[in-house]
Amino acid sequence: MKKNLKYYLKNKLTNKDLTFVPSSFDVVGDILIFSEFPRKLSKKEKVIGETILKTYPHIKTILKKTKKYSGKFRTAKLKVVAGEKRKEAVCRENGVLIKLDVEKVYFSPRMSSERKRILQLVKPNESVLVMFSGSGIYPLVIAKNSECKEVYGIEMNPIAHKYALENVKKNKLENKIKLFLGDVRKIMPKLNKKFDRIAMPLPKGGENFLDLSLRYIKNKGIVHFYDFLNENEFYKAEEKIKRVCNQYKKKCK
């Protein structure tokens, strides 16, 4: 958005109310999502939503998060503030189209640059595994934009998996992507396969699956592990990795 949202609301809200207007939001396709919407503006949310719709015609639905990410699928509750009463979106990222329900499937558009970084690291003929593959965004961008041999994806959320299957077909990548529904601890042993690269894009609790990734990574393979920490706490992630590597007698760097 070219100008700060407050600029377009200055004639519709009091100066005091303007100070509470959220400055950050996510856009997934034609849906705009406020992660944090102040209670003090609850009576003004319709005005704010309608203003966004009039100012930015490409936005069709405004949502606000009413419950933070929770549960085993890490999903959030969302409320329609203005516009079309739907939560399903189609967006384009790194050359692929992806369809999903933003309330029923975990998806972070803010990780787009990270997904691009990963795909640029993939070498020709690599076998890649994406644990917790969601609606398929990681397998899709890797398969579409790299010379990998294949990408496997495992997801426990049946709704996300259903979207992933549809997205693979939509992007005509059936020949490079193989998707599995279920618990990674049950699926991975059945694959009877090791990988050159394993991505673990789990927003919370990834350390509980590090042991699994180390068992199925090839020698000199690469595991992409994620942990959300403050800058002065990065050492904690390193300690988690080293502890598991030592446990399984793996060299890591």
Regions from the PLM with identified roles:
Residues M1-K253:
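SAM-dependent transferase fold signal centered on methyltransferase-like domains
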